[in-house]
């Protein structure tokens, strides 16, 4: 079964993986914030190999309708947004049914995507969406927003630098910024909440689930028109927290690695994702492929890639290359702490030979050349440190 909300003009098919639920109720809303539910439908529990799936087909044109799942276990109920949500309301707590065709900017479906055959010739710059245009010196009409990338002088800045690819720091929906607040806020965004939805604080209207999608696509289109590629920074190694996550609400601890003390924490963020489990693996692959198909992403930078397992990433590469044979894949080949996943299964630098098609950052070269990233009293080669020649 295809998970999430699959839209057609005549009906929408809802499907959720929930191995912990006794019952699941689909709740529909007119708004994505705090309005009362307008309809509820008990979902049908699957049988056999689909015994952990719940599904329901709602008839009528539901484009723009918000929804949530009521998970009932042991006669206790909790509301959750959809892990497979493609759109959502403000702060991501309610998912939204969306006709994605209406979010395409003019010409987006058939846009010309720049070709970059030689990955060794790439010149990549890392940016935060907020940092690009928030300062007054940027003279942007859309400070801190996706739409700032559609302004010619912003794109000219990157072109003049000689950049071939823009690596965008987390731009999916993250939990550390209140999208409903008008006060200035800032966060890098390594706090995943909705993996398949753009961040609302970077849109001009976080309350309308379609706006952030269209403006994200406009950003991608503008970068491509300027002759550059887009690399998306993705954080599949952990969630913002456990108990507020849709993974936990719908699936308990299934999505997380556990140890004797509780949650394994190789991310150093309080939890780590169990990428080796079948439904988690499928989720990560589905998510990556969705961003490439729907948003024309050219590549991915994996945060703490060493927390993820090798097999999942190799399978993801194969699926991604079916969509784009020149897909760009690289990441941090280390963890932020000890993991319950055996080291020989981790996507780390030491296992790079098992991961064809992936590049890895080298913190060793970085520290050797410029000095230790954390300790000022450990200089590097360019600062005159002795004994670095062999390392170089």
Where are these regions (language model features)?
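Short proline/glycine-enriched turn/loop motifs at strand-loop junctions of beta-rich domains
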Residues: 17-23
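Core domains of carbohydrate- and sulfate-ester-processing enzymes
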Residues: 65-116, 176-191, 226, 244-262, ...
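Substrate-binding/active-site clefts of carbohydrate-active enzymes
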Residues: 128-152, 156-295, 305, 312-324, ...
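The feature marks proteins involved in alpha-glucan
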Residues: 1-9, 36-40, 46-144
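Structural beta-strand segments of beta-rich domains
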Residues: 10-14
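Beta-strand signatures of extracellular beta-sandwich domains
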Residues: 25-27
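Conserved alpha/beta catalytic core and glycan-binding cleft of carbohydrate-active enzymes
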Residues: 91, 95-102, 317-392
